[in-house]
A protein has these predicted regions:
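Short, glycine/charge-rich flexible loops or terminal/linker lids adjacent to PRPP-binding catalytic cores
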Residues: 103-148, 158-161
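Acidic, divalent-metal-coordinating active-site segment for phosphoryl/phosphodiester hydrolysis
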Residues: 151-164, 186
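Short glycine-rich phosphate-binding loop at a beta-alpha junction
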Residues: 87-98, 178
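Active-site-facing substrate-recognition patch
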Residues: 25-86
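Phosphate/pyrophosphate-binding loops at sites that engage ATP/ADP/AMP, CoA/4′-phosphopantetheine
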Residues: 78-89, 164, 168-170
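PRPP-dependent phosphoribosyltransferase catalytic core
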Residues: 24-36, 164-209
Length: 209
């Protein structure tokens, strides 16, 4: 079996000069995603955030999550976070646009892992025509499904709170909230106060020190 990018997707089936463990693979993926985020997404300057705050740095997550390697790595690492923290999750979704590539990547990875998790996307407003849906993909979920809600970058948690409220109004249950980058500006605390601990691939401290 030939493995791309110098690491095995499945260490049981890949024959390489080096013997890899699951820990080796996770650390390699984690390091590669950090490098991509710093190269493609991290910027310094003066920025207005969606939360209304002003910041001296900005993480434009979509520059990474819409790249082929970035989408793959985010999908792998978010899938692992979801499974490690809540093995009974049966759906993954988030607010358009930031979550769109993430939920797609996680769903594809889950299929490759033979444990498929359908994706869904929460609109900011109803579609306005056709089915007039707020949530696209909900027909792939069972009534009352336990789902994970994801976002690329979390600041105050306001977007995630809106998603959670919308998901619950449709009869689904939120079992986990996850992000690629937690800016550590109150989002985790806001979510935890509502009973939803936030898990992340990187905190601001881990990403930029």
């Amino acid at each position: 079996v030939t493995c791309r990018n110098h690491f095995p997707r499945d260490p049981k089936t890949c024959i390489l000069q080096k013997t890899y463990t699951i820990t080796d693979i996770v650390m390699d993926e984690h390091g590669r995603l950090k490098k991509l985020l710093l190269e493609k997404s991290y910027r310094e300057g003066t920025f207005n955030l969606s939360s209304g705050k002003t910041s001296n740095f900005y993480v434009d997550g979509k520059q990474t999550t819409l790249s082929a390697e970035g989408a793959y790595l985010c999908g792998r690492l978010l899938y692992r976070l979801i499974r490690d923290h809540h093995e009974n999750i049966t759906g993954v979704g988030g607010m358009t646009l930031g979550a769109d590539p993430l939920v797609t990547a996680v769903s594809i990875v889950s299929y490759l892992e033979d444990a498929p998790i359908p994706a869904f996307i929460v609109r900011k407003e109803p579609k306005g025509h056709g089915t007039d849906n707020y949530i696209e993909g909900k027909n792939n979920l069972q009534p009352g499904a336990l789902v994970a809600v994801v976002e690329d970058v979390v600041t105050t948690g306001g977007t995630l709170v809106k998603v959670i409220d919308r998901v619950q109004s449709e009869g689904f249950r939120v079992g986990l909230v996850a992000t690629v980058v937690d800016r550590q500006e109150g989002g985790a605390e806001a979510l935890e106060s509502r009973g939803y601990p936030l898990v992340s691939i990187f905190t601001r401290q881990q990403l930029i020190g």
